[in-house]
Amino acid sequence: MPQIHLHAEPGDYAPVVLLPGDPNRATRIAARFDGGLDASRLVSQHRGLLGYTGTVDGVPVSVQTTMMGAPTTSIVMEELLNLGVTTFIRVGTTGGYGGLGIGDAIVALSAVGSAGMASVLGGGEPTAPTADFDVVEALVAASRANGLVTHVGPVVTSDV
C-alpha cells in the first residue's frame, strides 16, 4: 500500500536509509551514489520529501529527507518502517555541544528525548533508545578512516 506522505511502495527503498533534514542535502548525497544522480532512482518527491535509491560500492542504499524537527522525522520514519526499511542513519547538521568542532562527526549510542515529540512518543516517560552496535562500529570505523574527528556517546533530542 502506498504511504500517505512519501507516496512510495514496498521495494522503493533499500534496507539502509540515510536521513538528512534538508532536501538539497538528499540530492547532494544521491549524486555521490554509484553512477551519480543520473543512476539514482527518485522514489519520493511528494510534499518536498525527496527520496532516492541507488547503490554505494554495489550495496543498495537510499536517502530520504525528513525536513526539520522530530514530528516530521517521526512521520517519515514510520512510513519507511512500513516499507521495510531496517536501518536509519541520521546525517547532517545538529545543535551545538561544547567541545565539538565544525565538521566533527557524532555517532550516537543512544538518544534521550528531553521534550516535545520525543516525550509524546515515549508516553511522557524518559526514554533513551539505543543504536545497533554493529551500525555504530561501522559508522565509527568509516568516520575515522575518512580522517574525521569522531565523538561517540549518548545525545539529547528536543524539538522545543
Give names to the regions the model predicted:
Residues 129-160:
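Active-site rim beta-loop-alpha module in soluble metabolic enzymes
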